[in-house]
């Protein structure tokens, strides 16, 4: 159709904007939604101790989150729908339909792959319908440090678009601190930088030459696709980007299988260890560039058996089930599943039994034993 030919990137991969209907006027609420909560993931609920974690409560600008009696509730009427709680929670207690970590990465990856520049902005800053390379969010603080890290390892053409004074007058009073901290952390881990654009007149909406040119180097297209690309050069480029996004998604999904081969996914009491989406993104980036591991500064617990009474408080608090205690009382921490929240150390009643120390992040680089075996056999 004419629509497919005029905008193949959106047609093949889903619109980069929330509402592809160009006739509909800009409505900020179309880009926002109230998160839902899963109390089974909440560290505070699992431990029964308020001191275990307060990240969502601390970041919420409307004080609309209530954690009480093993439940996590959001006051829908008070919620600003900024999404900061989603980014702040290390265990994915909060979720939204349109802004999961992997969806946010994919959205940025599509734009950054096709355009000379990708801009991440908010509804208040943009105040209009976004172009194909503009990622419009409720608040830029929705992107966690882990998502920024994954973006910066793959792309060097991503900027934040926020005109001066936008954050100063925003009701999301905690958003500016949230995104500045997240970006600063990711920049420290990668050595890369996020651009900043404050003038809407300087926004660049040009496709990359490589994107336009990719019709000539795409060997994966069938004959019918080649006929279409002859009249629409960017269609092949859109398919190449779709292939790249799908390949990235497959590599992240494969991590679960690789970890099962290396250390197993189930604990002694048959609970399944859980990889959060943020951790998958970080591990995916490190699989691609393991040399970055020493620069990713995280803290993880170490166990001192001489001070431990095997009470199980730490294991019961860890909702990703990264901690296991076997029938002999030996405690094991599966580092890929640890989200570095520190709750286990906080709830431990025995001082020194668990201590947060700098993590050896090379443990997040998972060996692919099947691939290694294939390479070994091919070398024979």
Say what each PLM segment does.
Residues 59, 64-93, 215, 219:
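Charged, compositionally biased non-catalytic regions
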Residues 1, 204-235:
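N-terminal secretory signal peptides and thylakoid transit peptides that target proteins
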Residues 1-34, 38-40, 44-49, 84-190, ...:
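Flanking helices and flexible, charged tails adjoining ferredoxin-like Fe-S electron-transfer domains
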Residues 229, 233-285:
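Terminal interaction modules at protein C-ends
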Residues 7, 20-52, 63-81, 98-104, ...:
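Ferredoxin-like iron-sulfur electron-transfer modules
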Residues 120-127, 147, 216-231, 271, ...:
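Conserved small-residue-rich
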Residues 42, 53-56, 60, 79-85, ...:
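Short cysteine clusters
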């Amino acid at each position: 159709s004419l629509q497919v030919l005029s905008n193949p990137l959106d047609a093949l991969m889903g619109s980069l904007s929330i509402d592809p209907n160009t006739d509909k006027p800009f409505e900020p609420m179309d880009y926002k939604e109230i998160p839902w909560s899963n109390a089974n993931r909440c560290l505070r609920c699992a431990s029964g101790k308020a001191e275990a974690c307060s990240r969502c409560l601390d970041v919420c600008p409307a004080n609309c989150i209530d954690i009480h009696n093993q439940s996590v509730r959001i006051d829908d009427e008070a919620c600003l729908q900024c999404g900061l709680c989603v980014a702040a929670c290390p265990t994915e207690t909060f979720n939204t339909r349109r802004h999961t970590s992997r969806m946010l990465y994919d959205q940025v990856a599509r734009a950054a792959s096709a355009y000379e520049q990708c801009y991440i902005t908010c509804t208040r800053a943009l105040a209009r319908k976004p172009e194909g390379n503009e990622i419009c969010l409720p608040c830029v603080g929705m992107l966690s440090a882990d998502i920024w890290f994954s973006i910066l390892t793959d792309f060097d053409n991503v900027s934040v678009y926020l005109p001066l004074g936008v954050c100063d007058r925003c009701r999301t009073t905690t958003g500016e601190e949230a995104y500045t901290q997240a970006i600063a952390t990711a920049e420290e881990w990668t050595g890369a930088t996020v651009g900043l654009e404050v003038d809407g007149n300087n926004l660049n909406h040009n496709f990359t030459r490589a994107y336009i040119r990719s019709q000539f180097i795409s060997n994966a297209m069938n004959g019918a696709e080649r006929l279409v690309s002859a009249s629409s050069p960017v269609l092949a480029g859109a398919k190449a980007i779709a292939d790249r996004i799908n390949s990235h998604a497959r590599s992240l999904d494969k991590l679960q299988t690789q970890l099962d081969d290396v250390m197993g996914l189930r604990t002694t009491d048959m609970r399944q260890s859980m990889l959060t989406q943020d951790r998958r993104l970080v591990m995916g980036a490190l699989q691609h560039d393991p040399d970055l591991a020493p620069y990713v500064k995280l803290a993880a617990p170490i166990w001192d058996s001489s001070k431990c009474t095997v009470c199980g408080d730490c294991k019961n608090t860890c909702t990703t089930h990264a901690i296991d205690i076997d029938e002999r009382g030996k405690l094991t921490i599966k580092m890929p599943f640890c989200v570095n929240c520190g709750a286990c150390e906080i709830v431990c009643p025995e001082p020194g039994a668990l201590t947060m120390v700098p993590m050896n992040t090379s443990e997040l680089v998972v060996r692919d034993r099947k691939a290694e075996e294939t390479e070994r056999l091919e070398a024979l």
